[in-house]
UniProtKB/Swiss-Prot annotation:
One of its GO terms (molecular function) is NADH dehydrogenase (ubiquinone) activity. Core subunit of the mitochondrial membrane respiratory chain NADH dehydrogenase (Complex I) that is believed to belong to the minimal assembly required for catalysis. Complex I functions in the transfer of electrons from NADH to the respiratory chain. The immediate electron acceptor for the enzyme is believed to be ubiquinone. It is found in: Mitochondrion membrane. Its EC number is 7.1.1.2. The keyword Chloroplast does not apply. The keyword Metal-binding does not apply. Keywords: Electron transport, Membrane, Mitochondrion, NAD, Respiratory chain, Translocase, Transmembrane, Transmembrane helix, Transport, Ubiquinone. Gene3D superfamilies: 1.10.287.3510. Its main location: mitochondrion. This is NADH-ubiquinone oxidoreductase chain 4L. Belongs to the complex I subunit 4L family. One of its GO terms (cellular component) is mitochondrial membrane.
């Protein structure tokens, strides 16, 4: 079970490096990495220490909300979510 969780984490990291030009795919791969870490915490603590798991889950939700608002603002101001087009904008 632990090897499956580690494999899921590395698959998320691989998807992060492959799709590094699209912000939505970056956010999805980071969320999959967070979910594999949450699963690892659940296995490690065996549901005895639920407070730390809930704190980690709350931080995942806050990060996802901030990332989604960043994605919406980028698509509103710049017209797309490509990370390569951000290099062309010089302020």
């Amino acid at each position: 079970m632990v090897t499956l969780v580690i494999a899921l984490y590395f698959i998320g990291m691989l998807m992060l490096f492959i799709n590094r030009h699209f912000l939505m795919m970056i956010l999805l791969s980071i969320e999959s990495m967070y979910m594999s870490l949450l699963l690892m915490l659940c296995i490690y603590f065996c549901f005895f220490n639920l407070l730390s798991i809930f704190v980690f889950l709350i931080s995942i939700v806050c990060e996802a909300g901030l990332a989604l608002s960043l994605l919406v603002m980028m698509s509103f101001f710049y017209g797309n979510e490509l990370m390569m087009s951000m290099n062309l904008i010089k302020c």
